[in-house]
């Protein structure tokens, strides 16, 4: 008897989580495993790519990575963003929801944007009878806000 195909699980990653795919940190193995799983998808706000690139540059300036590692990480991010990731555009609807979230939770500006993107994407998934997303971040305040909004959460730092 044929087994039904497994539904894809979407993980919405903020930059603090997805950067771990490219730089070795606590939680790197867990993030890399998620990204390699054929039944799991990675979603991120387009602005998250800028945040990740800035993290790479900061690591380079701090001499935590070499110029070769920096170039490789940037190139890999560009390839993955084009080929693998669901990129969530930041539009007026996202901005309005993010503004509202800042009044309800202890969030920095871009963290509110990430959460708004995830909530909007989650509503779209559920409306299509797809599995709700998992919100992935290494930021505890952001994870608490996401959980408060009803999202399932994962902290890659909890997976050593």
Tell what function each PLM region has.
Residues 16, 53, 57, 99-102:
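Amphipathic alpha-helical segments within well-ordered protein domains
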Residues 1-10, 121-160:
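Acidic, PIN/NYN-like endoribonuclease modules and their adjacent C-terminal/linker elements
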């Amino acid at each position: 008897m044929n087994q039904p195909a497994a539904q894809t699980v979407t993980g919405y990653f903020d930059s603090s989580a997805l950067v771990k795919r490219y730089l070795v940190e606590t939680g790197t193995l867990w993030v890399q495993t998620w990204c390699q799983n054929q039944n799991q998808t990675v979603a991120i706000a387009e602005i998250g790519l800028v945040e990740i690139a800035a993290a790479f540059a900061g690591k380079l300036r701090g001499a935590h990575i070499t110029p070769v590692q920096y170039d490789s990480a940037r190139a890999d991010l560009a390839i993955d963003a084009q080929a693998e990731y669901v990129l969530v555009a930041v539009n007026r609807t996202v901005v309005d929801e993010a503004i509202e979230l800042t009044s309800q939770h202890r969030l920095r500006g871009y963290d509110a944007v990430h959460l708004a993107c995830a909530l909007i994407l989650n509503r779209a998934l559920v409306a299509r009878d797809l599995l709700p997303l998992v919100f992935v971040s290494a930021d505890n305040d952001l994870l608490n806000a996401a959980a408060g909004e009803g999202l399932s959460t994962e902290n890659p730092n909890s997976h050593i």
